[in-house]
A protein has these predicted regions:
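Fungal secretory targeting signals
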Residues: 1-22, 432
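Signature for phosphate-centric chemistry
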Residues: 19-145, 152-281, 285-432
Length: 432
């Protein structure tokens, strides 16, 4: 009896200790700073929302179009010259003995990564581009390999496209690469339409960013200054330090007009019944275009659920809105990709008797997204008629590229038409 009592006491003590240290059974959360670096985050799939990326039951993908940001680069010129290099130069010239400061002692022996040339795709970036090509081949095993892949003419987009081609093709010289000139008078007929848009400014939002940066870095600066008061820490130092670990604009009224060209061209490509067309369309661009396409599609809209369409209220300058939908690190890492799939859902329960079994859905980094006002298909996909109406409605809102951009040059166009060009591009071949 005494032994039973002792066992009970021991068991209760163990239970009490376990309760005080209780952890959720299925918690997988861990903070990874590389997933919070906005446009310089390495490619990852946040699975947001947490939905199955495979086609809905009874549906098969018949065609697909991808818009892909180039793979990881060493650094762009602006970031390197504004933040990265000034911080490392400051470190070289300081007399502070970092080895005697416990919290910052690593700086005594820290050597920054060698960036031989800015703007160039890294070795890991080339590998990730090839992996995306392999992933596509497994994801769409029944679709024909594309005849052509498109890329803007910058070296980093071309190299990224070549990497994907090498991962996607099964034999050498099957897929050609078509380069689309990054012109300043191309109108919407380009993979860099923002360069042909006089109203576009890459520095838009800088004032707001600087306002928030001062608040965000204030406690960090206070802590670092207490560690090393003679170093003259600045806001730019904090940004530079965080950028060395691993590049955001909101509320631009012309975004929808910049992104509509690709959305409209893609709808026409995927809905075409021409047997000579491709099954897979892949286009490489820079980080500026994918966010504008998401705006055109109405995705990750912070103000959508409020009905107020007050963008500024959803992105305050004095705190983090942790409930926001627009999270740059999730939607704009290197190699970020937006896919629009055309599906045949004749075998999907509840949809077998539809006159048109064709449905469309959008994926962002493999995560399925629901289009606002068009979710009448399996797993909230969009019917063919609904998608056509959706794109037409967006055209009424965003279809006037020349007007929205204030174009002053001749021969501008509101249409992205290079996909129908007879240019077959050039062979990429294997890298030996």
């Amino acid at each position: 009896m005494a032994m039973s009592t002792l066992a009970l006491v021991v068991a209760l003590a163990a239970l009490s200790m376990a309760s005080s240290q209780q952890q959720p059974l299925y918690s997988e959360y861990s903070f990874n700073p590389l997933e919070h670096l906005a446009g310089i985050a390495p490619y990852f799939e946040p699975n947001d929302p947490a939905r199955e990326p495979s086609p809905p039951q009874g549906c098969e993908v018949e065609k697909v179009a991808y818009l892909v940001r180039h793979a990881a680069i060493d650094a762009n010129d602006f970031d390197y010259e504004t933040y990265l290099e000034p911080f490392t130069d400051k470190l070289k010239n300081t007399t502070v003995d970092w080895s005697k400061i416990p919290g910052l002692s690593f700086l005594a022996n820290w050597t920054p990564p060698k960036l031989e040339e800015q703007e160039l795709v890294t070795r890991s970036g080339k590998l990730e581009a090839a992996q995306l090509g392999v992933q596509m081949s497994f994801r769409y095993p029944k679709l024909r390999l594309p005849k052509r892949v498109w890329a803007s003419t910058a070296e980093r987009t071309v190299i990224s496209a070549k990497g994907l081609i090498r991962g996607l093709e099964t034999d050498e010289n099957q897929i050609n690469l078509v380069q689309i000139y990054e012109g300043k008078e191309s109108g919407a007929d380009s993979l860099t339409p923002y360069k042909a848009c006089p109203a576009y400014s890459s520095s838009r939002g800088s004032e707001q960013s600087q306002t928030y940066a001062k608040k965000y870095t204030a406690p960090i600066l206070a802590r670092l200054r207490s560690y090393a008061p003679h170093f003259n820490w600045t806001v730019s130092d904090i940004i530079g330090m965080q950028e060395w670990c691993g590049y955001d604009t909101v509320g631009n009224p012309i975004s929808g007009s910049l992104g509509y060209g690709w959305v409209n061209a893609t709808q026409q490509l995927l809905s075409s019944d021409d047997n000579d067309d491709q099954d897979i369309y892949v286009s490489f661009t820079h980080r500026e275009l994918p966010p504008t396409v998401l705006v055109t599609l109405g995705l990750f809209n912070n103000s959508d659920s409020t009905g107020a369409n007050d963008i500024n209220a959803t992105m305050p300058l004095d705190k983090v809105n942790y409930h926001r939908q627009w999270v740059s690190s999730y939607i704009l890492p290197f190699l970020t990709n937006i896919a629009i799939e055309k599906m045949n859902c004749t075998g999907s329960y509840g949809y077998q008797n539809q006159t048109d079994p064709t449905y469309y859905r959008v994926l962002v980094n493999r995560s399925p997204q629901t289009l606002p006002d068009c979710h009448d298909g399996p797993q909230e996909s969009c019917s063919a008629a609904g998608f056509r109406d959706f794109v037409e409605e967006k055209g009424q809102m965003f279809g006037d590229f020349a007007g929205a951009c204030g174009v002053g040059y001749d021969n501008s166009t509101n249409v992205m038409s290079f996909y129908s060009s007879p240019d077959n591009g050039t062979i990429v071949g294997k890298k030996h």
